[in-house]
Swiss-Prot record:
Subunit structure comment from the entry: Homohexamer.
Name listed for the protein in its UniProt record: dATP triphosphohydrolase
Species name: Cyanophage S-2L
Amino-acid positions noted as binding dATP in the UniProt annotation, renumbered to this chain: R19
Recorded family membership: Belongs to the Caudovirales dATP triphosphohydrolase family.
Function: Catalyzes the hydrolysis of dATP, dADP and dAMP into dA. This step is essential for Z-genome synthesis (containing aminoadenine instead of adenine). Specifically removes dATP and its precursor dADP from the nucleotide pool of the host, preventing the incorporation of A into the phage genome and favoring the integration of the Z-base into the viral genome.
Length: 175
C-alpha cells in the first residue's frame, strides 16, 4: 500500500465525512460506514447469487475503497452528477487516490455490476431506515428505480440478477 492511500485511510479514520448532504436523515452516515456496508452486501449477496469467489472478492475489495476520494472532495449527491461532472470528478478522484482508479479499471464487468448494485442498494436501505420527509422518500425511490434498470441492463446472468433482487427485496422488507 502506498503512502498516499495510507494517508487517505488515516484521514478516513480521523474525520467524519458525512453523506447525504441534500437529504435530511435521522443519522449522519459517514463514508467509512457506507463502504463497510457495501462490502457486506457484496460478500453476502454475491455468494447467495452463486457468483464465482474471485468475482465476489474483486467486488468486495473495491467496495472497501470506492469512496476514499470523498474524504477530500466531499460527497457529491448522485442526482446532481451530470455526465460532465462525473467525468470531472473521476479525473480529480484518480489524482487523489490513483490506486482506486487502477483497481476500478481492472475490475471484471460482473464484479463491477455486483459492486454497483450493492452500492446503490446500501443507499436505498439507509434512506428507508434513516430518511426523513418526502424528499428522502423520493430520492430512495429514484435510486431504487435506477438500481433495477441498471441491473436489468447488466452483463449478469438472469439467475444472478433474480437472486440479487430477491436478496434486496428480502432485506428491505425486514427494515
Amino acid at each position: 500500500m502506498t503512502l498516499q492511500i495510507t494517508e487517505t485511510y488515516e484521514r478516513l479514520r480521523a474525520s467524519h465525512i458525512s453523506r447525504w448532504g441534500i437529504v435530511q436523515t435521522t443519522y449522519p452516515q459517514n463514508i467509512a460506514e457506507h463502504m463497510w456496508r457495501v462490502w457486506l452486501l457484496c460478500r453476502d449477496w454475491g455468494a447467495a447469487a452463486g457468483m464465482p469467489q474471485h468475482t465476489v472478492r474483486q467486488a468486495c475489495e473495491f467496495a472497501l475503497v470506492h469512496d476514499l476520494a470523498e474524504i477530500r472532495t466531499g460527497d457529491a449527491p448522485t442526482p446532481h452528477k451530470t455526465p460532465e461532472l462525473k467525468e470531472l470528478l473521476a479525473g480529480i478522484e484518480a489524482q487523489i487516490v490513483p490506486e482506486v482508479a487502477e483497481l476500478e479499471a481492472t475490475m471484471a464487468p460482473e464484479a463491477r455490476e455486483l459492486w454497483k448494485f450493492c452500492d446503490t442498494a446500501e443507499a436505498v436501505l439507509f434512506l428507508k431506515v434513516n430518511g426523513l420527509g418526502a424528499h428522502a422518500y423520493d430520492v430512495q425511490h429514484l435510486l431504487m428505480e435506477q438500481m433495477k434498470r441498471r441491473l436489468m441492463d447488466s452483463v449478469l446472468d438472469v439467475e444472478v440478477q433474480d437472486e440479487l433482487m430477491f436478496q434486496f427485496e428480502r432485506t428491505i422488507k425486514k427494515t
